[in-house]
Protein backbone atom coordinates (compact mmCIF):
# COMPACT_ATOMS: atom_id res chain seq x y z
CA UNK A 1 0.00 0.00 0.00
CA UNK A 2 2.97 2.35 0.55
CA UNK A 3 4.76 1.28 -2.63
CA UNK A 4 5.75 4.31 -4.70
CA UNK A 5 5.08 7.01 -2.12
CA UNK A 6 7.57 8.86 0.03
CA UNK A 7 8.00 8.79 3.79
CA UNK A 8 6.75 12.41 3.90
CA UNK A 9 3.57 11.40 2.06
CA UNK A 10 2.99 8.52 4.46
CA UNK A 11 3.57 10.79 7.47
CA UNK A 12 1.00 13.25 6.12
CA UNK A 13 -1.51 10.41 6.55
CA UNK A 14 0.06 8.77 9.63
CA UNK A 15 1.95 11.33 11.78
CA UNK A 16 5.19 9.97 13.21
CA UNK A 17 5.12 6.93 10.93
CA UNK A 18 8.20 4.72 10.78
CA UNK A 19 8.50 1.29 9.26
CA UNK A 20 10.12 0.26 12.55
CA UNK A 21 7.22 1.33 14.75
CA UNK A 22 4.16 1.15 12.49
CA UNK A 23 4.99 -1.40 9.81
CA UNK A 24 3.17 -1.35 6.47
CA UNK A 25 -0.47 -2.16 5.75
CA UNK A 26 -0.81 -5.46 3.87
CA UNK A 27 2.83 -6.27 4.71
CA UNK A 28 4.34 -8.55 7.34
CA UNK A 29 3.42 -7.72 10.91
CA UNK A 30 6.18 -7.06 13.45
CA UNK A 31 5.63 -10.50 15.04
CA UNK A 32 5.88 -12.12 11.58
CA UNK A 33 9.15 -10.30 10.88
CA UNK A 34 10.46 -11.41 14.28
CA UNK A 35 9.53 -15.04 13.55
CA UNK A 36 11.26 -14.85 10.16
CA UNK A 37 14.41 -13.38 11.74
CA UNK A 38 14.45 -16.11 14.39
CA UNK A 39 14.10 -18.81 11.72
CA UNK A 40 16.95 -17.36 9.66
CA UNK A 41 19.21 -17.06 12.72
CA UNK A 42 18.41 -20.62 13.81
CA UNK A 43 19.10 -21.94 10.30
CA UNK A 44 22.40 -20.02 10.06
CA UNK A 45 23.51 -21.34 13.46
CA UNK A 46 22.54 -24.88 12.44
CA UNK A 47 24.56 -24.58 9.23
CA UNK A 48 27.61 -23.27 11.08
CA UNK A 49 27.34 -26.07 13.65
CA UNK A 50 27.05 -28.75 10.97
CA UNK A 51 29.86 -27.33 8.84
CA UNK A 52 32.47 -26.61 11.51
CA UNK A 53 35.26 -26.41 8.95
CA UNK A 54 33.44 -23.56 7.20
CA UNK A 55 32.48 -21.62 10.30
CA UNK A 56 30.46 -18.89 8.57
CA UNK A 57 27.24 -18.29 6.67
CA UNK A 58 26.73 -15.44 4.21
CA UNK A 59 23.33 -13.78 3.99
CA UNK A 60 22.47 -11.46 1.13
CA UNK A 61 19.25 -9.46 1.39
CA UNK A 62 17.67 -6.02 1.36
CA UNK A 63 18.72 -3.50 3.97
CA UNK A 64 15.67 -3.47 6.23
CA UNK A 65 15.65 -7.23 6.79
CA UNK A 66 19.42 -7.24 7.39
CA UNK A 67 18.98 -4.48 9.96
CA UNK A 68 16.09 -6.44 11.51
CA UNK A 69 18.30 -9.53 11.68
CA UNK A 70 21.01 -7.55 13.47
CA UNK A 71 18.49 -6.25 16.01
CA UNK A 72 17.15 -9.76 16.53
CA UNK A 73 20.67 -11.20 16.81
CA UNK A 74 21.39 -8.81 19.68
CA UNK A 75 18.09 -9.51 21.45
CA UNK A 76 16.57 -6.14 20.53
CA UNK A 77 13.96 -7.61 18.20
CA UNK A 78 13.53 -6.54 14.59
CA UNK A 79 12.68 -2.94 15.59
CA UNK A 80 16.21 -2.74 17.00
CA UNK A 81 17.29 -2.56 13.37
CA UNK A 82 16.34 1.12 13.50
CA UNK A 83 19.57 1.66 15.45
CA UNK A 84 21.73 0.42 12.56
CA UNK A 85 22.54 2.51 9.50
CA UNK A 86 23.26 0.30 6.50
CA UNK A 87 24.53 1.46 3.13
CA UNK A 88 24.29 -0.42 -0.15
CA UNK A 89 27.01 -2.94 -1.03
CA UNK A 90 28.59 -3.11 2.41
CA UNK A 91 29.74 -5.97 4.58
CA UNK A 92 28.48 -6.64 8.08
CA UNK A 93 29.54 -9.49 10.35
CA UNK A 94 27.61 -10.79 13.34
CA UNK A 95 29.44 -13.06 15.72
CA UNK A 96 30.24 -13.92 19.30
CA UNK A 97 32.59 -12.84 22.02
CA UNK A 98 32.62 -15.95 24.14
CA UNK A 99 28.92 -16.81 24.41
CA UNK A 100 27.62 -13.24 23.95
CA UNK A 101 26.25 -12.25 20.54
CA UNK A 102 28.06 -9.26 19.06
CA UNK A 103 28.42 -7.09 15.98
CA UNK A 104 31.94 -7.80 14.73
CA UNK A 105 31.80 -5.41 11.79
CA UNK A 106 29.00 -3.22 10.47
CA UNK A 107 28.46 -1.31 7.24
CA UNK A 108 32.05 -1.81 6.04
CA UNK A 109 32.75 -0.61 2.51
CA UNK A 110 34.18 -3.19 0.15
CA UNK A 111 37.01 -1.84 -1.96
CA UNK A 112 38.72 -3.63 -4.83
CA UNK A 113 42.14 -5.12 -4.23
CA UNK A 114 45.02 -2.94 -5.50
Model-derived features with residue positions:
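Alpha-helix N-cap/helix-start capping motif
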Residues: 38, 63-64, 88
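Generic beta-sheet signal
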Residues: 53-64
Amino acid sequence: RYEGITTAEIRAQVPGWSVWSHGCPDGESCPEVEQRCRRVIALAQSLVASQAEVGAVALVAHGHILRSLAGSWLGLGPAGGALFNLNTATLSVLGHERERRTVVRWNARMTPAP
